Amino acid sequence: MRNKIFIIFGFILFIFCFIIFYKGLQKPNIYSPELNQKKSIPSFVSLDFYSNEKVLSDDIFKKGNYYLVNIWSSWCIPCRSEHPFLIRLKNSKINLVGINYKDNINNAKVFLNELGNPYSKILSDKDGVISIELGAYGVPETFLINKEKVIIKKIIGPINNESYKEIVNLIK
């Protein structure tokens, strides 16, 4: 009798858990790039990578210009693979802003000296707060910001040939 109660209770618990997980899987992915697009860039205060002085986002991002915000770290292997694409974008009609994410400043400087610095401005994000405000969940992540200061494209993971071409087409 006691075993029968445990079996019935276990079966009911299994069904309950199955229903909860099934319902959870039916919800849209909150991390989907499409859902996080079309929002204005948030206002924030950061530190300049080189001078360590406070910088306001409103002083960096001006209406009328395209910006590519790239969140990177020296310890990030995929960041190395996307770096040649960023170097190529440096000479286009877009301002590249790098956000150095939870990194050792000396290691980050070695990274840039070794691979080149594609950024017109680099901000330090030692605690990861700015990246989270932008909607990033890791590195590398890249955001294309239009002339109205609205995020129009989010790239999760390294920039590749396909995403590079898409960026170039969007800023034409």
Where are each of the predicted segments found?
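N-terminal targeting signals for export/organelle localization
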Residues: 1-47
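Short pre-active-site segment immediately N-terminal to redox-active cysteine/selenocysteine motifs
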Residues: 65-67, 71-75, 138
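Hydrophobic beta-strand anchors of alpha/beta hydrolase catalytic cores
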Residues: 68-69, 96, 142
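Short alpha-helix adjacent to the SAM-binding motif of class I
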Residues: 81, 88, 106-114
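Thiol-based oxidoreductase modules, predominantly thioredoxin-like and allied folds used
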Residues: 94-107, 119-128
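Thiol/disulfide oxidoreductase modules built on the thioredoxin-like
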Residues: 113-118, 125-171
